């Protein structure tokens, strides 16, 4: 029996300034424990397919609780990592 690759799906959110779509993201095993399903914000990326898969190893460095800028053609797509359990005390959720 073939095993399906498991992915976490970002939740659907609405924002006044930008559209946020659900995206399938492949998480390494060690990150799956600490990272909440990612929120992907679509900003100024008309060529971005909202059903396209994004891989964390395409990101230049992984910084929890910070906005990340995707390289090359994903440069306008920002990813916010959220901890599953306790949020960092210096993280203000009202800014998201």
Curated annotation (Swiss-Prot):
Superkingdom of this protein's organism: Viruses
Protein name per the record: Putative protein p29
Highest classification ranks of the organism: Viruses, Duplodnaviria, Heunggongvirae, Uroviricota, Caudoviricetes
């Amino acid at each position: 029996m073939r095993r399906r690759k498991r992915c976490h799906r970002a939740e659907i959110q609405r924002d006044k300034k930008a559209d946020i779509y659900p995206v399938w993201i492949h998480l390494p095993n060690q990150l799956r424990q600490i990272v909440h399903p990612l929120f992907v914000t679509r900003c100024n990326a008309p060529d971005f397919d909202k059903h396209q898969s994004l891989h964390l190893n395409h990101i230049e460095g992984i910084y929890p609780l910070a906005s990340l800028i995707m390289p090359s053609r994903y440069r306008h797509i920002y990813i916010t990592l959220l901890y599953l359990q306790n949020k960092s005390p210096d993280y203000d959720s009202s800014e998201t």
